[in-house]
């Protein structure tokens, strides 16, 4: 079995390295090299540099604006970014909800949401875990009740989510909600897209043991969400959630970054005289 990269793959690797040498935002690199935290604006600048190159949809098919890269090219891309010490890509749009939308959403939803994900004009967060519903995710209780007003259909959302990463920056949240409690717990879950600026949403920080603010609690009190923001069929959210998790694990593997940190540990070990 031939496991080495092809000449085409090596050319692509060189293209990625050239991009990082010339188009990786210098102020972002300098901050990371100096151990300084990145602002929201820094993170957006980094992602927009990838968007300008046409690489934001690195794992998307061409028909939806992606690169259509091979698995080898995707590996090379992620590996080179990690080895160069680039900020991790925010996965919630491009690696999580984006594939759900282009796989299960209707055409109007694809037209509305996918371009903003590719341009990083919309920052997404993930509304899965709840207090008491983490590993047993299907036990979630955040409720969505259907209502009609002036000829339009909505869901009224009440409940909360927790450990919501970077919700303090997010414009939208993709959210698992309970639309039916009569059957098996997996059967009554639906997948909604919710504007984080909707009245009734409150984000509270969770400060972790290292003093960092990365995760949050998100509270929903009578939040009105247009029914057109439902992905796929009502009650099929568990299927879409599992599909998303497969993309999530792939998107956050961090192989290149792990290699870089391993090399750093080797250097530290040598400096300490540990052979």
Protein language model regions, located:
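A short, Trp-centered hydrophobic/proline-enriched beta-strand micro-motif
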Residues: 120-128, 176
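Hydrophobic, small-residue-rich alpha-helical packing segments that form membrane-like cores
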Residues: 133-136, 155
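A structural signal for short hydrophobic beta-strand segments in well-ordered beta-sheet cores
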Residues: 142-146
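Glycine-rich beta->alpha junctions and the first turn(s) of the following alpha-helix
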Residues: 201-275
């Amino acid at each position: 079995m031939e496991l080495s990269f092809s000449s085409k793959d090596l050319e692509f690797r060189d293209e990625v390295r050239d991009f990082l040498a010339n188009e990786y935002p210098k102020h972002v690199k300098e901050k990371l090299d100096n151990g300084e935290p990145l602002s929201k604006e820094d993170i957006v600048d980094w992602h927009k540099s990838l968007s300008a190159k046409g690489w934001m949809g690195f794992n998307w098919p061409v028909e939806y604006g992606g690169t259509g890269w091979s698995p080898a090219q995707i590996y090379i891309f992620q590996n080179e970014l990690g080895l160069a010490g680039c900020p991790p890509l925010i996965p919630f749009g491009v690696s999580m909800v984006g594939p759900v939308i282009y796989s299960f959403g209707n055409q109007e939803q694809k037209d509305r949401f996918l371009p903003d994900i590719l341009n990083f004009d919309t920052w997404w967060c993930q509304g899965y875990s709840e207090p008491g519903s983490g590993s047993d995710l299907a036990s979630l209780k955040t409720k969505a009740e259907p209502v009609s007003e002036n000829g339009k259909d909505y869901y009224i959302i009440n409940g909360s989510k927790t450990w919501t990463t970077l919700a303090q920056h997010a414009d939208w949240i993709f959210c698992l909600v309970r639309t039916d409690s009569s059957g098996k717990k997996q059967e009554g879950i639906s997948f909604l897209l919710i504007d984080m600026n909707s009245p009734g949403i409150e984000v509270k920080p969770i400060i972790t043991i290292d003093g960092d603010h990365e995760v949050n609690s998100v509270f929903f009190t009578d939040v009105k969400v247009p029914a057109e923001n439902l992905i796929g069929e009502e009650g099929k959210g568990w299927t879409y959630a599992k599909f998303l998790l497969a993309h999530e694990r792939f998107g956050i593997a961090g192989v290149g970054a792990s290699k870089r940190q391993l090399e750093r540990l080797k250097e530290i070990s040598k400096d300490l005289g540990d052979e």
